[in-house]
Amino acid sequence: MAQNWTAWIAGAMRMDEATWARHANPWSAWTRLPILPAIVVVLLLRDTLGVATWVLLMLPIIWVWLNPRAFPPPATLDAWVSRAVMGDKLWVERDRRPIPQAHAAMAQGLSLLQAPALVPLVWGIWAKDAPLALTATALVIAIKFWFLDRMVWLYDTRAATEDDAR
């Protein structure tokens, strides 16, 4: 099976076991939330910011890479967002460790659902229409949270199955 795009991204980010463990820290997951809004706001203000736009765009982009490495692993994986991260890891590794079809179908569907929301987001940025761009950003984030909730379900399902097998 061809490598999935999420696995390619994780590979480019050098997401090894230690990095995933650190990324499961709730501080890591929650401090990623403002990345997309920050990028959108900087792009909306590009005329006002001028050359500083490029510097301000680089900060959240650098944070995307640094973030999973910036915090220690959590003491437990009990937090909702920690389980979401570990479910996301299972999703990324689905070519090597198959996941139940129902989880795969829902995750793929939610990923596809984000695509139409990107159209008004990109248009809003291009047209400097802040209400449109920010509404679309909120929609993309809402769909991402739905996806993360499904990743929690995937992680909990896998954890229960593996616990039952012991």
Regions found by a protein language model. Give the residues of each.
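A cytosolic-side transmembrane-helix exit/cap motif
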Residues: 70-84, 151-164
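Helix-coil boundary and interhelical linker segments in multi-pass alpha-helical membrane proteins
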Residues: 41-55, 122-134
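Alpha-helical membrane-embedded segments
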Residues: 134-148
